[in-house]
Amino acid sequence: NSLILHNKRQIHKDVYSRNAKGEKLMLRPVYSDKEEATVVCRYIKQLQLKEHFNYSDFAILYRTNSQSRIFEEEMLRQTIPYRIFGGMSFYQRKEIKDVLAYFRVVVNPEDEEAIRRIINYPTRGIGASTIEKIIACAHLNHESFWSIINSPVKFGLKVNNGTLNKLRSFTELMSSFIAKVETMDAYQLGVKIIQESEINKDIFSSTDPEAISRQENIEEFVNGLQDFVESRCEEGREEYSKLTDFLQEVSLLTDVESDDDKEGEKVSLMTIHAAKGLEFPTVFIVGMEENIFPSPMSSSSARELEEERRLLYVAITRAEQYCFLTCAKNRWRYGKLEFGTPSRFLNEIDPAFMEIFSDDFVSERLSRPVSPKPAFTAASIRPAHLRPVKIPTVASKNHADQSTSQTISTADGLKIG
């Protein structure tokens, strides 16, 4: 109630529960988005033991679809079954499968399924009839699809000169990527592929809501590449940070996911929009930071900001027993490490109804300082003319212990920690 009172366009009402007085909202500041996923999974396991909850008693709510990626990966690592409510898992989304198909061809040009997926994406004028001719020519010559498009004249592919030029441009592009497999890490080569194939231009050319969701997914995918490389470097395994290694890790994660696709006791992951009308004993509302929640698109409109506030109200009221909110001090966004500001909405919740927790689930307060981390830089994959703000690269910072101290100020001045 204290939150929604900040909306001017509302019919005043006081919401109450017929259940016994519940727990306060629990705010858990974390160092990074990676730690956010780890902490949420840890709390799920703790509450299972403490309250004898089933996995289906938990929901993780986020503002945008792209935020699911890091939670999916952590749950797969910790063997916590989950389902994406009202959508599909991160690596099954079309735009992600398209990029992965490029990666697969770069690592293995003989992957015919992948090459047929990308040969005309983004559109380059190589249509279905040409693809059928390539397949027929490959069968006739007992050669691979890749061999035919690399040497179409040699193998007698019957297409016109315009199509031959298009095939040559495609194979030259892919060969330029293949040449970098051993010299670039997964992030460097991945960004190069997304940019030079012009996937980024295709994805960022529209501003409709579905297109924005695809853009956020691609940006989160790049964050995942960056996170993968950084993790390998921190482990002293830089030599295993190549594109081949990244694909192996994704394959392992998606194999685990496909082995557990039956309905049953699973944690629900969903956007807040998808959560309307549902309730769960325990809810985690993640990404409580400015430019995530509220969305950056709401900053110029009082009406849209009120809608964001209503969404948080909806999210909080999905919880029957426990409601956790998390905010990260650092988060990979748009291929760069950004320093987060806790959401202004946290300042609007009556402090009497919110507790701040550290790594100890019960009550231990934040107490130890964050120590610096080696610098690590990244670049944006948005086409230059489409970037909303030009932000210089930011160096990341390490933390020696996951139970850390941080004093964070929200947009409206709330101090956390």
Where are these regions (language model features)?
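Helicase P-loop NTPase motor core
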Residues: 1-81, 104-108, 164, 178-181, ...
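Short, flexible loop/turn segments with low-complexity composition
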Residues: 13-16, 237-238, 359-367
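Short strand-loop junctions, especially beta-strand C-caps/beta-turns
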Residues: 30, 58, 87, 328-330
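Structured loop/turn residues at secondary-structure junctions
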Residues: 32, 63, 87-88, 272-275
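Conserved GTPase G-domain signal focused on the G5
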Residues: 36-37, 128-129, 358
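Conserved helicase C-terminal RecA-like lobe
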Residues: 54, 68-80, 93, 100-355
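Conserved helicase motor
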Residues: 64-65, 84-94
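Acidic, low-complexity intrinsically disordered tails
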Residues: 349-417
